[in-house]
């Protein structure tokens, strides 16, 4: 019965163009990767799909730091943080991360998690008890949505970036604890939340602002310190989640907040308490990643990435203008996430296939990840791309625009 039920659902997904497939990366994360799929021989692709925004995932210094960490601390942690898995490497990283966020969160403390998904589940389930209401942007990441659904708090969602509706919801809220929850950079659209206005609402209505900065950490702000730095924000009402497997090039995530909040997560956050700690070698290497991000090299990489973003948007805007009947639309994004909105699922898959045939790896994103009718190619740029790489992508899209029906 179960297998028949699942098979029927799979057939329905295939008919709607929603079936997901995995590819196998046969080489390190980089703009040029050897990739195989469905048992076919691997081929080299020019990839515009990773979240390795600064190109650190295969940086020699991080590769060496990871190896050094393994030699010093071994391969695994062996237990959860509250048993015997909390190593000196984890503690040192948390100290570095707290200092990293101190300009934005007074007296900040930090807690390291295995993944950003776990960090968000931990935050919302531990803080969102029955005395709380969670106010969530409708385009928040799935982990924030799932965390809010698992929490005992009431959840109210507001239309994307609609602060008028949010203000009305806050004004009518009667629970003593109010948690405003938002992505900083929205993962499928690339646009920025209005964090200054959200913080102003938090202060006006005695609420707390939880910011998921998965796609801003390392890329935005002074020395790559993230979206809070980008907007020049500073407040004890800020609760910050940053991921360490995107711009930081490794893995894991962290929460930075008032020490009382971090202490409560240690006591009450089940995804933290009941998870084996990440390998200490990763924590050790992440300290080197923070050094790189804040260094002159990190600044050069961010500047180059910004030039690529401008180049891509300028050239794609011209291409879209030359082919108005295709109905393509470039999302309003100033970040390394540059979605090309195509419309229906079949069109997005056809465009992805046309680029694939040219050796370009750009994923098609479809519902339920994005709203129905907004299927898109999610183009992401890295500091290790070149201007010639971006030109090749634009040329590939131009070729597809001429050939697709």
UniProtKB/Swiss-Prot annotation:
HAMAP family: BioF_aminotrans_2. This is 8-amino-7-oxononanoate synthase 2. It catalyses: 6-carboxyhexanoyl-[ACP] + L-alanine + H(+) = (8S)-8-amino-7-oxononanoate + holo-[ACP] + CO2. Pathway: Cofactor biosynthesis; biotin biosynthesis. Pyridoxal 5'-phosphate binds at residues 116-117, 187, 215, 243. Substrate binds at residues 20, 141, 369. Keywords: Biotin biosynthesis, Pyridoxal phosphate, Transferase. It is an enzyme of class 2 (transferase). Its EC number is 2.3.1.47. SUPFAM superfamilies: PLP-dependent transferases (SSF53383). It comes from Polaromonas sp. (strain JS666 / ATCC BAA-500). Catalyzes the decarboxylative condensation of pimeloyl-[acyl-carrier protein] and L-alanine to produce 8-amino-7-oxononanoate (AON), [acyl-carrier protein], and carbon dioxide. One of its GO terms (biological process) is biotin biosynthetic process. The modification N6-(pyridoxal phosphate)lysine is found at residue 246. Its cofactor is pyridoxal 5'-phosphate.
């Amino acid at each position: 019965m179960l297998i028949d039920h699942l098979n029927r659902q799979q057939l329905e997904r295939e008919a709607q163009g929603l079936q997901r497939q995995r590819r196998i990366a046969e080489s390190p994360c980089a703009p040029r990767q050897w990739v195989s799929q469905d048992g076919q021989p691997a081929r080299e692709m020019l990839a515009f799909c990773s979240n390795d925004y600064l190109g650190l995932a295969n940086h020699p210094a991080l590769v060496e730091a990871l190896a050094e960490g393994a030699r010093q601390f071994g391969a695994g942690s062996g237990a959860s943080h509250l048993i015997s898995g909390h190593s000196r490497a984890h503690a040192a990283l948390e100290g570095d991360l707290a200092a990293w966020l101190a300009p934005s969160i007074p007296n900040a403390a930090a807690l390291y998690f295995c993944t950003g998904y776990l960090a968000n589940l931990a935050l919302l389930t531990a803080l969102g008890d029955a005395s709380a209401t969670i106010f969530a942007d409708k385009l928040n990441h799935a982990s924030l949505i799932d965390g809010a659904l698992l929490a005992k708090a009431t959840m109210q969602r507001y239309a994307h970036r609609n602060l008028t509706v949010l203000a009305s919801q806050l004004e009518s809220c009667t629970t003593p604890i109010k948690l405003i929850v938002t992505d900083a950079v929205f993962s499928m659209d690339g646009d920025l939340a209005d964090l200054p206005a959200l913080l102003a609402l938090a202060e006006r209505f005695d609420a707390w602002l939880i910011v998921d900065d998965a796609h801003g950490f390392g890329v935005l702000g002074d020395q790559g310190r993230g979206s809070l730095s980008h907007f020049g924000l500073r407040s004890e009402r800020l609760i910050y989640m940053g991921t360490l497997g995107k711009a930081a090039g490794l893995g894991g995530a962290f929460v930075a907040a008032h020490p009382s909040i971090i202490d409560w997560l240690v006591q009450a956050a089940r995804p933290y308490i009941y998870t084996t700690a990440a390998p200490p070698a990763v924590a050790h290497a992440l300290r080197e990643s923070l050094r790189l991000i804040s260094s002159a090299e990190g600044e050069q990489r961010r500047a180059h990435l910004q030039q690529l973003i401008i180049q891509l948007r300028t050239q794609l805007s011209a291409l879209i203008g030359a082919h108005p009947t295709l109905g393509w639309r470039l999302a309003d994004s100033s970040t390394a996430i540059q979605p090309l909105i195509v419309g229906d699922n079949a069109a997005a898959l056809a465009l992805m296939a046309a680029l694939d045939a040219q050796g370009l790896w750009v994923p098609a994103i479809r519902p339920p990840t994005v709203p129905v009718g907004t299927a898109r190619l999610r183009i992401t740029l890295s500091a290790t791309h070149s201007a010639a790489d971006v030109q090749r992508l634009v040329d590939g899209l131009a070729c597809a625009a001429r050939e697709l029906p």
